[in-house]
Amino acid sequence: MKTVYFVRHGSTEGNEEGVYQQVHTPLSALGRRQAACVARRFERIPVDIVITSDMARAAETGRCIAERNRLPIVFDPLFQEILRPAIVRGQRRDTPEALEMRRFLAENWTNARVKHSNEENFFDLKQRALKALAHLVARREKTVLVVTHGTFLCMLICCMMAGEEVSPPWFDRLHHFLVLKNTALSVCEYDQGKWQLVIWNDHTHLG
């Protein structure tokens, strides 16, 4: 059996101020405190390796956990957050330009042939999640800690449940239902070809 501990990255100023994140957005002061809290939690949880998204906010969270617990760490773009168009990154979500882009993305979320620029649509995100799950299954480690992002982790859970059958309406409903705090811990197990969600959104380490 393989156990995968998923941790969402710590908070950023973008999270706190309603701004679309940049790839290089670092943790805020609050996010660094959250990362330290979850790192202490893993003093009591044996883990073979830390795999983290290479986006700065996740990489910083993963590095904090790995350094405190003397664990090997791998930075993997497979576990990045859903990619938004470059034009909105760094913008507040309530600007006219961002609202118009949000409308465009919503209208074309399920259209595999239409994109504004370099963003991911539903099909891109699903295929990357399926690839990430296959990668985790193939790794030799039995206990893995993955530091990733809220929307991508939701898609991972959907793909664990339904694989290629995940549909846009199904994902959208689950995405709004599965609330995830910054640095919250979720645990999944893989055994005999099947995934099981054991713990979701455990943030007791934050007090």
What kind of region is each of these model predictions?
Residues 131-194:
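Active-site-adjacent alpha-helix immediately C-terminal to a catalytic or transition-state-stabilizing loop
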